[in-house]
Regions:
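Active-site mouth of glycoside hydrolases
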Residues: 4-285
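Short beta-strand segments
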Residues: 134-137, 207-208, 263-266, 289-290, ...
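Catalytic-core region of carbohydrate-active enzymes that cleave or remodel glycosidic bonds
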Residues: 278-367
Length: 491
């Protein structure tokens, strides 16, 4: 549940005074099998070692998984030479007849229990390790932002792939209202089945869909890259996503289930990129994952293009105001990027940082973990360890009483409960002092190196009146540093 005391954070139902801070790495195949190199499906679907994945997260101090739903049984990644031929899917493959992959067609009125068994097992296994899981009901990205023709022809709801006479031709037939009543009824049955399968697990959050369409027009060059002719009309999924949220809420209430936090994430494309997050903020969802909304991209372009400036969400995120819990996911503003400073900046601005971790596409135990390259396992290690470090600080502090207070430090990064606790980031690594405006009192001080991850205990500081107090990072700590101040004798 969202804390009434500080709506930037969740709390557990019986303890509204303890914030639940979420952070972790995620990747496309953490639920399904079938992702690997090359455009064609493998004869035997590739498997992620889920137990090793949980070990990998736990070792780095992570406590959150974005559990991916990929709806195509045959597809490829945009711009990447690898396939996503994902199995199991929620519906039984009974035939008669063969689907596009030459395996039996789907019966969309019969569930594949192996999918739901795996779904429950993975959420439960994460819970046993103290991790929360956001379960994604649907995926939009694969239906309109992955290469043609398999973006649609590799989906169970394509006419060639099922025995039920259902035939979608684009994302507009699947995630944009009004829908064919038969399609919507099948979606409703599936959503209810997912909720029935997982409702009693305490570590559960929901997500409607990853990057569904938002009513904007595709750039023709981008559409051509995907193999889609002309300017595709993808429609606006907003009303449909609100319908899914309402459906989940109604079903939980009707069945007497515990209510789990609902999330809505960035849509693409949208008519005005600077307003990309407006439907999320206006939604009935408790948590959101925003997308890039920088003015520099108002006329087109995006932060993933070569030579493009980076989004503020990566480099200088806005402070969370508590309108929604913000799970800040690099997937929506900086896929393929993320470092230690990103994690710390996001945390000190009141967000929950999670990493779209391309470094584990090949698994969490690569043959050479130290091998270099921008998408290598090693490239993302600083971000991974930093996420765990932010969590350790979050759980030491009374985070529920703290808020982003950029005005209290000359660095622009402070999370504070004035007069009690302050956590300050000096991001530049420049030699020399910075200031923190403190309330009167005595404070214990502790320094932490963002890159080296080592601590230095500082001398106690006493201030007689509210004033900007100067602090100089210890010479032993090179690079960006964190200063933790806690009132002496505080409860």
């Amino acid at each position: 549940m969202v804390s009434e005391a500080n709506r930037r954070y969740f709390t557990v139902a019986d303890d509204d005074r303890t914030a639940v801070y979420l952070t972790g790495s995620h990747i496309w195949n953490n639920l399904h099998d079938g992702m690997g190199p090359g455009g064609g499906c493998a004869e035997a679907p590739e498997e992620l070692d889920y137990g090793a994945y949980l070990d990998f997260l736990a070792e780095r101090g992570h406590n959150f998984i974005r559990l991916w739903r990929w709806e195509q049984f045959k597809s490829q990644a945009a711009g990447g030479d690898f396939h996503l031929c994902m199995t199991p899917q929620p519906w039984a493959r009974t035939g008669p007849g063969a689907a596009k992959d030459q395996k039996p067609k789907f019966d969309l009125e019969r569930f594949e229990e192996a999918f739901f068994d795996r779904l429950r097992a993975r959420v439960a296994a994460a819970g046993e390790r103290g991790m929360y899981v956001a379960v994604m009901f649907f995926d939009g990205f694969g239906l309109h932002l992955s290469p043609a023709p398999d973006h649609v022809e590799g989906h169970p709801f394509h006419a060639a792939n099922n025995v039920n006479g259902i035939g979608i031709g684009s994302i507009a037939d699947y995630q944009v209202l009004p829908l064919d009543p038969r399609v919507q009824a099948l979606q409703e049955a599936y959503v209810r089945k997912v909720v029935d399968t997982l409702h009693d697990l305490p570590n559960l959050l929901w997500e409607v869909a990853n990057e569904s369409s938002g009513g904007g027009t595709a750039d023709p060059a981008f559409a051509e890259m995907l193999g889609q002719a002309g300017t595709p009309e993808w429609g606006d999924s907003t009303a449909w996503q609100y319908w899914v949220i309402d459906l989940v809420r109604r079903h939980e209430a009707e069945m007497g289930y515990d209510r789990h936090p609902m999330g809505m994430t960035m849509q693409f494309p949208v008519p005005d990129q600077t307003k990309v997050n407006a439907p999320l903020l206006a939604s009935p969802a408790e948590w959101i994952s925003p997308g890039y909304d920088d003015e520099i991209f108002a006329g087109g372009g995006h932060p993933m293009a070569p030579g493009s400036p980076q989004s503020r969400w990566l480099e200088d995120p806005p402070a969370a105001d508590g309108a929604k819990v913000v799970i800040s996911d690099t997937d929506h503003y900086a896929p393929g990027r993320g470092d230690a400073l990103w994690a710390w900046k996001s945390f000190l601005r009141g967000h929950h940082p999670i990493l779209m971790d391309f470094g584990i596409i090949g698994g969490v135990n690569p043959p050479d973990p130290a091998a270099g390259g921008p998408m290598s396992f090693a490239a993302f290690e600083p971000a991974r360890w930093a996420m765990g470090d932010t969590r350790r600080f979050a759980e030491r502090m009374r985070l529920i009483e703290m808020a982003p207070r950029n005005d209290l430090s000359s660095t622009g990064y402070a999370l504070a409960n004035p007069g009690q606790e302050y956590l300050v980031l000096e991001p530049s690594g420049a030699a020399g002092p910075f200031t923190v405006t403190l309330e009167p009192g005595g404070y214990a001080t502790e320094w932490f190196s963002v890159e080296g991850r080592n601590r230095v205990q500082g001398e106690a500081t006493t201030v007689d009146r509210a004033a900007a107090t100067s602090f100089d990072p210890p010479a032993a700590l090179a690079g960006p540093t964190v200063l933790y101040l806690k009132r002496i004798g505080d409860r």
